[in-house]
């Protein structure tokens, strides 16, 4: 289990200058050839996303104005706060900020032939499945995960194991991304 606070994470600038990324976790760790990866991105200007052949991307707007995504296959989609959207990482996708407002997004990327991600908003206590990886990012409220208290802009990631996230206040929300391995793959077989 790894815990994070985005206010304390290192920032990497994008090559095109239109944003920056804070990597939450990568599996296997410390490799460019990841099976799955989670990050927080800040989009500061209009431009194309980097290509990731063979990768599915799930992007969720956390803060800022809406973002219009346009793909070369004639799809358009407007990112709205806390509503995950999935698209192919090997497609050219351009992001246009509404009214020029910077946005902050949670990004989950999975190698299409190894695993998949499902991202959803949780607003009550829940327990994860034991054989799946996951990432949580607290939007609001106070949450207990093991012996750790998590509040806004904090979270955790894991590669497997059963974990209970307990909401400690009457209201709160977090984003939960569950990573499911495809048949024939497990965290032990892909390292």
Swiss-Prot record:
Gene3D superfamilies: Jelly Rolls
Database matches in SUPFAM superfamilies: RmlC-like cupins
Similarity annotation: Belongs to the Ves family.
UniProt protein name: Protein Ves
Species name: Citrobacter koseri (strain ATCC BAA-895 / CDC 4225-83 / SGSC4696)
Name of the encoding gene: ves
């Amino acid at each position: 289990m790894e815990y994070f606070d985005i206010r304390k994470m290192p920032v990497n600038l994008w090559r095109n200058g239109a944003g920056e990324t804070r990597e939450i976790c990568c599996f296997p760790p410390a490799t460019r050839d990841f099976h799955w990866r989670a990050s927080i991105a800040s989009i500061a200007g209009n431009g194309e996303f980097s290509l990731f052949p063979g990768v599915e991307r799930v992007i969720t707007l956390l803060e800022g104005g809406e973002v219009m995504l346009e793909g070369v296959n004639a799809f358009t989609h407007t990112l709205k706060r806390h509503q995950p959207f999935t698209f192919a990482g090997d497609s050219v996708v351009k992001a246009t900020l509404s009214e020029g407002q910077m946005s902050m997004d949670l990004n989950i990327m999975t190698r299409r032939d190894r695993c998949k991600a499902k991202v959803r908003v949780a607003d009550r206590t829940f327990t994860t499945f034991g054989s799946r990886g996951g990432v949580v990012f607290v939007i609001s409220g106070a949450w207990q995960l093991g012996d750790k208290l998590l509040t806004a802009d904090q979270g955790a990631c894991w590669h497997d194991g059963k974990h209970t996230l307990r909401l400690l206040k009457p209201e709160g929300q977090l984003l939960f991304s569950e990573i499911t391995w495809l048949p024939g793959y497990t965290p032990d077989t892909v390292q």
